Structures are given as structure tokens and as C-alpha cells.
Design a protein with these regions (language model features):
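Short acidic/polar hinge/loop motifs at secondary-structure boundaries
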Residues: 91, 118-146, 194
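C-terminal beta-signal and adjacent terminal beta-strands/loops
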Residues: 694-698, 721-791
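Extracytoplasmic beta-strand/coil segments of soluble accessory domains associated
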Residues: 52, 80-119
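Outer-membrane beta-barrel signature, preferentially recognizing the C-terminal barrel domain
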Residues: 316-325, 455-462, 522, 533-592, ...
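Gram-negative outer-membrane beta-barrel transporters
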Residues: 589-591, 609-699
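A beta-strand signature from Gram-negative outer-membrane beta-barrel systems
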Residues: 134-173, 177, 218, 790
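Transmembrane beta-barrel wall of Gram-negative outer-membrane proteins
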Residues: 184-287, 318-338, 511-513
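N-terminal periplasmic "start-of-domain" segments of outer-membrane beta-barrel proteins
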Residues: 43-74, 100, 108-111, 118
Length: 791
């Protein structure tokens, strides 16, 4: 962290760095190539117009495309930040973070994340990839593919987000970006990056690098009760119901280092490309929690002289180190029988985490110290080979077929040191000042680390896919129809003694079809239908049993799970507006089969009578539907060509029936919308704008816990000044409304308590809560000052 500079001095340093490294002269004219115009660096740094949403023209699938110009003026830090402005993407992240994208509000594992059209592994057990690992500066455009196609893997129930990074045929010249971000706790973090593209030998290359300081100073406030408003409307004022209050600071500090490079050769009959990116993250998550037995008092330990209200002091620190890289090569050759392409890719993800948690409990005859240490290591490697061929069937139709072979290896290692727990002296409590001292001071040397239950395992997934696809492009109509056959062999090794190996395999047939029909000169109907799938979460596949994982209930893994499958359709209409605007509406529906849900096996749990062993099984069905509207246009039709407006709203719904009743898919927001305006002032070389975003509430229900989540609104503004054709400076304010994330937790120890039954199964007088918790989290506004210089 940088602590000694002011925001003003950071801005001066950013400008000086950009100016000092810039050549005296810069290229201004873009270069032409066979595929169109290559963007000059000046066009990226000094935006000559307002960016709008594009519609996909090269494919029959329903695709929404957003170039970097659409996002850049608000200076998003990551791909996740950029996606907050597009339709139907929600997040359940902490405030001012955007990691697991939830397309159509569904859990992240239902969305396929691609980078340059290829899948990448991540650390998450649900197979999702956190988008806050990709710096926004690397992005050329973002594509939302609402349906599926036989040419891609079918892991896209909600749809696909394709992050297209810049390459040498999309940039000529270079630019530097430098600046700082100022946070609510007066911390300042740097942001420095650069990109350069140009000709090299017979082709073109691009290299880019970025360094980003990350910081999130969250403050959490929790109130806990032994009953809820379901049973006691006066719970908040009833002293017999109040349990404790927790005040917590949760600070996330990190440094991201990223690099990407591409090299492309486009010949008369043969094309070659190779691209890669690398991201390294060092991150420290520091939580400090104080629990009090009073709703408002802030003082010293309970049972001291004089007695205070502090019952627990907890210090929790996680140090995380992540490396992620991907390399892909493609060779395409056009010959008398069509075009043949070969793609080879390798992706690797590695995470190492060391977490400590130290706690002192004061509400005892003698205060007690408890210490825990955990080490987590996750490595995920994927190697893939893709061979495809296409040839014409007629003047307007062609046939594509091909196959994919992929070898995925994932290893997990979770080890724990034996818990250190011992009593302190009464003198340790007397005069203890939690704001000056820390439970860490009572730490003693730990013993050797040993595997956690089910914590050491490997998963090998080999898949062989084949597909065939026909597509046509006729005046006013573009269509495609195909089928994909996916086969998977799975080997799971639980290496925690006693070691266990289990094999599984499955096959899925996934047909798909899409069509686009022009309506008049500027309208278009889009329609698609497809069968898609979602593979089981890794943490469900381990055969280990985790005791008291779900309240007092146990969780037993199931390595024989099959993927979920879904039939669905999208139907939409798009209308071009003015010079470059577009408006669209879309309805979608998914019928999910073989839904993976936690199921009561009927076996008594480790905590005795009233508790059970739960296991994920393919037993459920679900439905998802919604309506999506988006608008992006200038106001030239009312005489304001330099004013751009954009907005979108999505209404989202779903239905699942579990053992507790009907609910939505976990975490699905009821709606999400955002709208904004950008005013360009060409005569002054300036621009300003604002965007407003609001996400509806969400509900999660699992065995032993229910969570209601709500977010406050988010307001962002920017002011931009351009200097000549090569230099731009922007000031951006985000989270200006200091929106809070608010959660309400219903917690239960047994299934019957959650159902509102006595342990003998007879009806109870309301549900029996183990705990009802209200939590609020805020982080404050963030201000940026960024400078860019093109050369």
C-alpha cells in the first residue's frame, strides 16, 4: 500500500510518468488490412465519439458486443467491473468488488467464461472463473452470447461471456496509462499499464502489461438474536432474544501483475496466430472482529474491573498467492476442399493460501485463547486440441464439423495444524485494550500440518467431443443448426487416508439452432434454441464425509453425479436507432433437468438424533425465465448528436422445489438495471457522464441456513479532458452513494428445526432458530485519476 502521498501528488506523478516516456512524434493514421481497419493508439486514448452497444453480424447466434470504448470512460479496473454495465449480469460479491459473474442471476457455474474464445480454469469449486482476475485494460471487447452453438462446449446454461483481448490486428502504436485510486480510509493505490502493437516480420504483434494495486476497506456490523421476526415481532428490543453484536473491519489488500502478448500472420491461404496472458496476484485479507453483549456499547472485556461488554476478540488473516496463465495457438489453411483449422491450448491455475485465525474468549472464568492455521493449495491444468473443417454446400450454405480433446487435472490440498487452545490468566483480561492489542500476541508454536477430512484429492477429467453444424447466410436471413456430442471420463482420487479411487463417465447429446431475420432496413428478429449442461461442482465430487458441515448435519460427497442439462430458448428483437444506436428486447426460458440438490439420505448424522447425512444427488428440476431490455444511442434525432444515453433492465425469475418448499435458484436477483448518460464537448476536448446501477434482492436456501441479500444503488461519474490527439486525463468517482450490502441469515441446527417441526416430527410452534443475524457491509466511495498517452 502507498500511504504517504496525497491524491494530488499521485496525479502529478501519473502525468509526469506518461509525458516523460512519450516520444515526440506519434503515428496518427490507422493501417488497413484485409480484415478492415486497425485501430490507432490515438483512437483508444483520445476517444473521438461515444461508444455504443453493437450487435453481432457474423454469426446466427444472439450476441451482444461491447467494445472497450463503451466502458473505458468509467475506467473499470477489471473485467468484472466492466460487466456491471451490461444486461442481466449480477454479482453477489462484497461491496466494490465484482468477481463471480451471474448471468441471468444464476450462480456463476451456470455461465461459461471464455477468454479469446477459450475456457480457462479457476480456483472456484463450481468451475467458474473470477472476472476480477482480468484487468480491464487488456480487453478489446466483451461479448454476451445468449444461447449456445454446437461449435462450442455446452457448459452454458445461462449463456456465455467471451472476453476478447486486444491483438496485433486491432491496434497500431502504443499507449501508457498511469494513475491512482483513493479509498475511503485514505489509502492510495497505483495503477500503471501499457500496450503496444505493430508489424513484425510477416505478421503483427501486440504486447501489454499492467500493474494494479487493489484495496477494499470494508466495515461490517452484525446483530445476532436467538429468534427472528417470524416468531417474535419485538425481537429487536427483547433483551432475552438479543445474543451479541459484532463490529468487524475486513480489509482486502492486493497487487495484480498481468501481461499479454499476441502474434498473428494472415496469408493468402494460411493464417497463424499465437496468444497468451499471465496474471499474478498477491492478496491479503485481514479481518478483525469484536463481539459485544450489548447492542451499542464499545468498551473493554466482560468480567474485568470495571466490567465491560467485550466477549470475543478475533483476528483472521488469509494470505493468497495466485498465478494464472493461458497459451493458445491456431493454424488455419484454406484449400480446395474448404478450410481446416487446428487449435492447441494450455491453461494453468495455481493458488496457495495460508490462513490464520486467533481468538480470545473473555466470557469465562479464565479467558481462553484458540488458534487455527490452515494451508490450501489448488492447481488446475487444462490441455486441449481442437480440429475443425468447413466447406461450402452451396452458394449460401456451408457445413462445419470437428472435434475437441481435453485433459483436465485438478489437485486440491487442504491441511490443518492441530488446534491450539488454552486458558489465559485473569491478568490477561484486566486492562486488555482491543484497539491496541491483538490475539496474535498469545500465539504459540503449532504442530505439524495434517490433511483435513477429504482435503487431499485429485480429479482428472478427460473429454472427447464431436460436432457437426450447418449454417446459411442469405439476403435477410442468417441461420445455423447443429449438434454436439460430449463424452467425459472422470477419475477421482481421495488421497486422505484411507485412499479411495472412483471412476465415472457420462455422455450428452446437445443440439442447437439459431436464426436472425431482418425486418425492414433496420430491424431484426433473433431466435435460438439449445440444450446445454452444467457439470457437477468439484467439492460435491469428493467421496469424503464432512461432519457438522450443514448446521449439525453432515455432508457426504457423491462422485457419481451426472451433469445437469437444460433445454431453453431465446427470442428477441433489435432495432437500430440514429447513427449508431440500438435498442433490443429479449425473452428467455430454461428448463433444467437432473438438478443437483442436497438430499437427506435418512442416515443419522454424527451429532446424533435429529441430525442427518446429506448428499448431493441428481433429483430435482428447475425453471428459469425472464425479460431483458437494453438501449444504447445518441440523441441526434432531437438535435443532440454529442449526447449518448444507455440503459438496460432485466426481470429475472426461476422456480425450484426442494425439501423445504418452493424457491428461486440460489442467489438469483429479482431484477437488475442500470442507465447512464455521456456528454461529449468536442469544441473543448472534454466529456463527462454518469451511470446508475441497482440490483434486486436475492435469496439462498441450503440445509441449515437461509440468506436474504440486498444491495444499495451504485452511482459512478467521470470527467474527461483531452489534450491534442495523444493525451487524455480522467477523474472518476465510484460507489458515490456508499451503497451497503445487507444480509439477513436464518440459521438452524437440524432439518426439523428449519421445517418448523419438533425433533419427533410433530408440528412445532414456529421454526426453531439457532441464530438470526443481520449484517451490513460498507466500503465508502473510491476516486480515480488516470492519464493516458498514445505514441
Amino acid at each position: 500500500m502507498i500511504r504517504i502521498f496525497s491524491l494530488h501528488s499521485a496525479a502529478v506523478a501519473a502525468l509526469a510518468a506518461a509525458l516523460a516516456t512519450a516520444p515526440a512524434a506519434a503515428q496518427e493514421a490507422p493501417i488497413q488490412n484485409a480484415d478492415g481497419t486497425i485501430t490507432s493508439a490515438q483512437d483508444i486514448v483520445v476517444l473521438g465519439s461515444i461508444g455504443y452497444r453493437n450487435r453481432g453480424e457474423n454469426e446466427a447466434e444472439p450476441v451482444l458486443s461491447y467494445d472497450s470504448e463503451f466502458f473505458q470512460r468509467f475506467e473499470p479496473l477489471t473485467a468484472g467491473d466492466a460487466l456491471k454495465r451490461v444486461p442481466s449480469v449480477t454479482f453477489l460479491s462484497d461491496v466494490i468488488e465484482s468477481d463471480g459473474a451471474r448471468l441471468r442471476g444464476l450462480p456463476p457455474g451456470y455461465t461459461q467464461i471464455l477468454i479469446n474464445g477459450e475456457k480457462v480454469p479457476g480456483s472456484n469449486a463450481d468451475r467458474s472463473f473470477f472476472l476480477d482476475r482480468i484487468p480491464a485494460e487488456l480487453i478489446d471487447r466483451v461479448e454476451i452470447v445468449r444461447s449456445s452453438s454446437a461449435r462450442r462446449t455446452g457448459d452454458a446454461v445461462a449463456g456465455t461471456l467471451n472476453i476478447k483481448l486486444r491483438d496485433g490486428y486491432e491496434l497500431d502504436g502504443g499507449y501508457l496509462r498511469a494513475g491512482g485510486l483513493y479509498y475511503d480510509d485514505k489509502e492510495l493505490e497505483p495503477s500503471i499499464g501499457g500496450v503496444f502493437g505493430g508489424a513484425l516480420g510477416p505478421g503483427r504483434f501486440l504486447i501489454g502489461g499492467n500493474f494494479q494495486g487493489r484495496h477494499n476497506p470494508k466495515k461490517k456490523y452484525s446483530l445476532r438474536y436467538n429468534d427472528s421476526p417470524e416468531n417474535d415481532p419485538n425481537y429487536a428490543t427483547d433483551p432475552d432474544v438479543f445474543e451479541n453484536r459484532e463490529d468487524q473491519t475486513d480489509t482486502r489488500d492486493g497487487k495484480d501483475y498481468s501481461f499479454n502478448a499476441t502474434y498473428d500472420i494472415k496469408g493468402d491461404t494460411t493464417d497463424f496466430s499465437v496468444n497468451g496472458f499471465y496474471v499474478h496476484t498477491d492478496r491479503t485479507e485481514t479481518e478483525r472482529s469484536f463481539e459485544y453483549n450489548h447492542p451499542t456499547n464499545i468498551n473493554g472485556p466482560i468480567r474485568a474491573t470495571p466490567p465491560g461488554n467485550l466477549t470475543v476478540d478475533n483476528a483472521n488473516v488469509a494470505k493468497i498467492n495466485q498465478d494464472n496463465y493461458s497459451v493458445n495457438g491456431k493454424l488455419a489453411h484454406r484449400w480446395s476442399l474448404g478450410e481446416t483449422s487446428l487449435k492447441i491450448g494450455y491453461a494453468w491455475f495455481d493458488e496457495k493460501q495460508f490462513e490464520t485465525e486467533y481468538e480470545v474468549e473473555f466470557d469465562r472464568a479464565l479467558p481462553r485463547f484458540t488458534g487455527d492455521q490452515t494451508r490450501t493449495g489448488i492447481t488446475d491444468k487444462e490441455f486441449s486440441v481442437r480440429l475443425e473443417h468447413e466447406f461450402p454446400l452451396g452458394e449460401n450454405t456451408k457445413l462445419l464439423f470437428g472435434g475437441l480433446w481435453q485433459d483436465k487435472d485438478r489437485s486440491t490440498s487442504i491441511t490443518e495444524a492441530p488446534r491450539d487452545r488454552y486458558n489465559l490468566t485473569a491478568a490477561n483480561r484486566q486492562g486488555y485494550d482491543q484497539f491496541a492489542r491483538n490475539p496474535t500476541e498469545f500465539m504459540r508454536p503449532f504442530g505439524a500440518f495434517v490433511p483435513a477430512v477429504g482435503g487431499i484429492n485429485t480429479i482428472e477429467e478427460k473429454r472427447l467431443d464431436g460436432f457437426v453444424l450447418a449454417e446459411g447466410d442469405m439476403p435477410g436471413v442468417k441461420w445455423e443448426a447443429g449438434v454436439r456430442y460430449e463424452t467425459t471420463d472422470l477419475t477421482i482420487d481421495d488421497l486422505t487416508p484411507p485412499a479411495t479411487r472412483i471412476d465415472n463417465d457420462y455422455e450428452k447429446l446437445l443440439p442447437s439452432a439459431s436464426v436472425k431475420i431482418d425486418v425492414g432496413a433496420r430491424g431484426r428478429i433473433t431466435a435460438s434454441a439449445a440444450r446445454t449442461s452444467r457439470r457437477p461442482e468439484f467439492n460435491f465430487l469428493s467421496p469424503a464425509q464432512l461432519d457438522a458441515e450443514l448446521g449439525d448435519n453432515d455432508l457426504l460427497g457423491n462422485p457419481l453425479l451426472d451433469p445437469e442439462t437444460a433445454w431453453g430458448f431465446d427470442l428477441g428483437y433489435e432495432q437500430k436507432l440514429g447513427r449508431s444506436g440500438i435498442a433490443g428486447v429479449n425473452v428467455f426460458y430454461r428448463k433444467v433437468n437432473d438438478l443437483i440438490e442436497l438430499t437427506n439420505t435418512g442416515v443419522e448424522g454424527s451429532e446424533g438424533a435429529g441430525t442427518f447425512v446429506y448428499q448431493p444427488q441428481n433429483i430435482g428440476d428447475g425453471k428459469v425465465w425472464g425479460v431483458e431490455f437494453d438501449l444504447s444511442t445518441d440523441l441526434g434525432f432531437v438535435g443532440l448528436p454529442d449526447t449518448g444515453v444507455f440503459g438496460n433492465i432485466s426481470w429475472l425469475d426461476s422456480k425450484i422445489i426442494d425439501e423445504f418448499g418452493e424457491r428461486r435458484f440460489n442467489g438469483q436477483s429479482k431484477y437488475v438495471y442500470n442507465f447512464g448518460v455521456i456528454q461529449d464537448i468536442p469544441s473543448a476536448g472534454a466529456a463527462f457522464g454518469a451511470t446508475y446501477r441497482k440490483q434486486g434482492g436475492a435469496f439462498d436456501r441450503t440445509v441449515g441456513e437461509e440468506v436474504f441479500t440486498a444491495y444499495g444503488a451504485d452511482l459512478e461519474v467521470f470527467v474527461e479532458k483531452r489534450f491534442g490527439k495523444s493525451f487524455t486525463i480522467r477523474a472518476v468517482g465510484s460507489n458515490l452513494l456508499n451503497g451497503a450490502k445487507r444480509e439477513a441469515f436464518n440459521k438452524f441446527t437440524t432439518r426439523n428445526a428449519q421445517l418448523g417441526l419438533e425433533e419427533d416430527g410433530t408440528p412445532a410452534d414456529g421454526r426453531r432458530f439457532d441464530e438470526y443475524e443481520l449484517e451490513s457491509e460498507k466500503a465508502g466511495p473510491v476516486f480515480q485519476l488516470m492519464a493516458r498517452y498514445a505514441f
